Amino acid sequence: MDVKIDGPLYSGKAKDVLLTDDPEIVAVRFRDDITAGDGEKKDTLEMKGYYNSVISAKIFEVLEEAGVPTQYLELREPGCILARKLEMIPIEVITRNIAAGSIVRRFPFTEGQEFVPPLIQMDYKSDEHGDPMLNDDIILALGIATRDELEEIRRITLHINSVLRDFLKSRGLILPDFKLEFGRDSSGRIRLGDEVSPDTCRLWDMETGEPLDKDIFRRGEEGVVGAYRRVARMILDDEDIERWNVEL
């Protein structure tokens, strides 16, 4: 895709969003920054952004093939994705298949408990307010999204969960939970945005139960980038590695 990258539009905790000469397209650059605890714990890990970008690109392509509307257009190069410009909705949509992390600390669930059907949790994306949990009434009162948009977000989320669980299972990975963000394109259509990577998903090795995600960093352990590289090796096909010239 022949577009010229211009100046910055937005800078988040681990990515920069850049304008291009096409008003409908942005470039998303993945940085090596990693955070936890609402940004209280920080570090920079070489190649982390590189692997997150190729993992996200692969997963976006899998989802697009399954009919999920996303903002993804192409991986320009490892570390940079071209995407549709979205008006982001400040909701973090968390899907839980297995009880782990904060849900166990905040509610009387047992670690490893399976949720059938999966739990869908929505949090207000606001560091200022501590990312509080939302319900439909609060979302509607805040004017964040309409009732129809919420129904569409839930429908897409459940479809994503089904597609992702099957795909990752075929690659030897378990998906306990993951976080999604959505936005509106220029026509008002709801699309999946942000990223889908070990930064936003819990991923466990199916054989060993070993975590291959940001939980490693949360626990203060070594091997974060090695785990992300391993996820990339597990989900990328030889064709992906060749066309994107991925270093593994």
Swiss-Prot record:
Metabolic or biological pathway, per its Swiss-Prot or TrEMBL entry: Purine metabolism; IMP biosynthesis via de novo pathway; 5-amino-1-(5-phospho-D-ribosyl)imidazole-4-carboxamide from 5-amino-1-(5-phospho-D-ribosyl)imidazole-4-carboxylate: step 1/2
Keywords noted in UniProt: ATP-binding, Ligase, Nucleotide-binding, Purine biosynthesis
The UniProt record lists the keyword Transport: no
A GO term, aspect molecular function: ATP binding
Keyword Ligase tagged: yes
An annotated GO BP: 'de novo' IMP biosynthetic process
UniProt-listed PROSITE patterns: SAICAR_SYNTHETASE_1, SAICAR_SYNTHETASE_2
EC numbers, comma separated: 6.3.2.6
Reaction(s) catalysed by this chain's protein: 5-amino-1-(5-phospho-D-ribosyl)imidazole-4-carboxylate + L-aspartate + ATP = (2S)-2-[5-amino-1-(5-phospho-beta-D-ribosyl)imidazole-4-carboxamido]succinate + ADP + phosphate + 2 H(+)
Principal EC category: ligase
Alphabetized InterPro entries for the sequence: SAICAR_synt/ADE2_N, SAICAR_synt_PurC, SAICAR_synth, SAICAR_synthetase, SAICAR_synthetase_CS
Family: Belongs to the SAICAR synthetase family.
Protein's name according to its UniProt entry: Phosphoribosylaminoimidazole-succinocarboxamide synthase
Lineage of the organism: Archaea, Methanobacteriati, Methanobacteriota, Methanomada group, Methanobacteria
Gene: purC
